[in-house]
Every structure is written in structure tokens, then in C-alpha cells.
Amino acid sequence: MTLLGWLIFLAPWGVAGAQLGRFWHISDLHLDPNYTVSKDPLQVCPSAGSQPVLNAGPWGDYLCDSPWALINSSLYAMKEIEPKPDFILWTGDDTPHVPNESLGEAAVLAIVERLTNLIKEVFPDTKVYAALGNHDFHPKNQFPAQSNRIYNQVAELWRPWLSNESYALFKRGAFYSEKLPGPSRAGRVVVLNTNLYYSNNEQTAGMADPGEQFRWLGDVLSNASRDGEMVYVIGHVPPGFFEKTQNKAWFRESFNEEYLKVIQKHHRVIAGQFFGHHHTDSFRMFYDNTGAPINVMFLTPGVTPWKTTLPGVVDGANNPGIRIFEYDRATLNLKDLVTYFLNLRQANVQETPRWEQEYRLTEAYQVPDASVSSMHTALTRIASEPHILQRYYVYNSVSYNHLTCEDSCRIEHVCAIQHVAFNTYATCLHGLGAKLVPGFLLILTLLPSLHVLEVL
């Protein structure tokens, strides 16, 4: 595969220095192996369900999951933009949105293997930290808290990326921890199986600590603190709430609370959290009990353009996105991120995939870096400045949806970004819905630990 005829617009890197490194984060590739440009709108892609796909193109459609051509182009665009990243984060969801009976265990494993082989082909010498998504199992979502065939088979597929200890851990529960590459050896990546906490997972309902992952995570973070390491935490299903509707949480509440406790206790060694699942571009702030910002989670957009069927979400498609982070190799401090995207409509018309820069975080939100304090400032601006809110809203769908983010939209996004806990999220929805007055959102953002009912 070559890039002949491709138009990829490269961005100048904003930070210079010997300690600056870069890494890719990709998520939610969702390959639909049966995608075809058919004259019959009901035969284009199984992932569209019963919806007719009227204008399918070679690079995909907003009603469908990714054709192979789209995923292939995304990986080769990554190689063209930054061929030698320090490492790659890959946070899962590889299979299409189709019923369980349309897949099966063998098909799930075949898709994971196909995408694994593509990444190895394009980046043969790059370390990859990979997590399973809720669609990377059969039946989907039903991840067990103990060893099983899929964990064992995926561990074999990912064996070149795993140490002996990680290989054994993955087979037990699909989570592991690895040192970061490079001479400093001052950091590590923790890969979580948060599918164990998913509210749709009946296998772990009623368990206090599925697979003892929380206990293990606490031990890893405590050891990192003792050893002077900083940590990146990655996974697929994030805690908190979906920002494109109201009251849609992913974790069971008890697991959500436990995750928050871990972050609050160990936030000083966590240099960043990186998740997917939403297909959208957003972030989540974490605060201590005094209201001080202590950590941030980045939600990377998906490669799949698939329009979600989640109740309450209006026109929930997105353009395909890929993301690169700039970081300090010595401290793991995040300096910036750049999101690249494919305008799918344009690509299908031109029959050429033009991956281009969508935005650079420091420029978009007028902040010095991608640190916790900077992301808190970004949230403040999103909450209080309409033009920044609108800019964020367009980026949230990877420049697919250019409609105006009105009051109800603002409530959904600000409360979801600011409040990962169930109780404070509910309070935020109530307060913002009842009291949308100038300055009120800014007060809420600057004082996140306050209960809205106390400031009314």
C-alpha cells in the first residue's frame, strides 16, 4: 500500500527539545468486513441494520462501520504523519455493530487478528499498548472475570507486545502493565479491562472487584509512587456519562465510585488517562474533595463513522479521527495533542482520502499545554464562552455536526466533562437546567465540588 495521490496536511509540531516524544492513540476501528458499495441500499453494510444506505462511497458511510479501505487508510496516514512514534495506544472495539448471532467467537478473533496484523505491518518496530473493547468478545459485553478462550487467543496475537508477566496477566483478566520504551525508564502504561465494569456486562454483576483488577491497580500505582514512576492509564469503556445525551452512564455505580477513589488516591502518579468507546472527541476532569483539579481523561474519537443508535442521541455520527500526543519523555507531562480527520463526504466525492489536521489543542483552547490545569481552563472556557463551546462541539463530532450547541446541549456536555461521579452529575443537570443565567456556568466550573443546590 502506498500513499500515491493522497493529500495529507501535516502540522508543525509546537514544542521542540530532545525530551519531546510523540505517541499515537487510536480507538474504535469497528471493521465491517462485509461493507460493499452496492446499488441495493439494504445490502451495503450489516452494521446499518435495517436502515437503507443511499449514498455509500468507497471510504464508508455515516450509517456504517468502517470498511477495510478506511481503516487501512487511517493507519497509513498515521505512518505518513509520524512514522516513528515512541509507542501507540490502541483502545479497542474492533468488530462491527451487528447482533451476536451475526458474528461468533471465531469471527471476533479473526477481526482482532486482522487489525493486529495491519498495525504490525505498518508499524513493525513500534511498541503497542492494546486494550480490548466491549465489542471484542462473544457475546459482546459479557467479559468474564477469569481466564477464557478469547483472552488466551488475544494474548497470543499480542505476544510480541507483552512481557512474560503481562502475557500471564492478560490471559487471566485482559489487563496488564508495561514499562514505557526509552532510556529514562521513568514511566509505564497501565492497560485496564474496564469492560468488567460495564453496566451491560451480566458476568460481573454483583461482584465487588471483578478479577481483582482494582486491587491490582492500586498495587501497581503504589509501586509506581515508591519507584518514582509516572503512569498512563488506558482502557476502552470510560467512567462517567456520555455527553451527547443525559444520564447515560457506562459503569455500574459501585464500580464508578471505586474508580474515582483510585484516581483521587493515586492521582499524583497518573500523568494521563486515555479512553475511547464514545466515538466522539471529549475529555473528563477529576477533582479532589476541595474542588481542585487533580487529573484528566482524554476520550479519543473513533475511526468508525457509524451513527449511534443510542436512545436520546440526535444524529450521532462522526468523521473518522486519529490523534497524536506530544509529551515530555522525562516526566510524561502532556504538552499537546493534534487530531487528524477524514471528511468522509468529501473523500467519497473525490475518491481520495484526504487526512488533514482538524485542530491542535493548545491553539483551539488557548492553553499552554495539555496538563490538568490547562484542561480545567479549557473546561472553564467551554462553559462560559459561547464561541469556545461551539468550537468544542464541532470537534466533538470530528467536524461532522456544525449545528449550534444550544442550552440543553451545553448542559449535557459541561456536566459530563466536569462530573464523573453519579451524584454530582445529577446535581449539575438539575442546577444548570434550572438556572441558566450568565456567569452561573462559570461559577460551577470554577467550584466543581460545590453542590448546585447550595449556591442557588
Curated annotation (Swiss-Prot):
Zn(2+) 2 binds at D93, N134, H236, H277. Its EC number is 3.1.4.-. Changing H135A: Reduced phosphodiesterase activity. Decreases inhibition of innate immune responses. It is an enzyme of class 3 (hydrolase). GO terms for biological process: inflammatory response; innate immune response; membrane lipid catabolic process; negative regulation of inflammatory response; negative regulation of innate immune response; negative regulation of toll-like receptor signaling pathway; sphingomyelin catabolic process. Residues 1-18 form the signal peptide. It comes from the Eukaryota. GO terms for cellular component: extracellular space; plasma membrane; side of membrane. It is found in: Secreted; Cell membrane. This is Acid sphingomyelinase-like phosphodiesterase 3b. The gene is Smpdl3b.
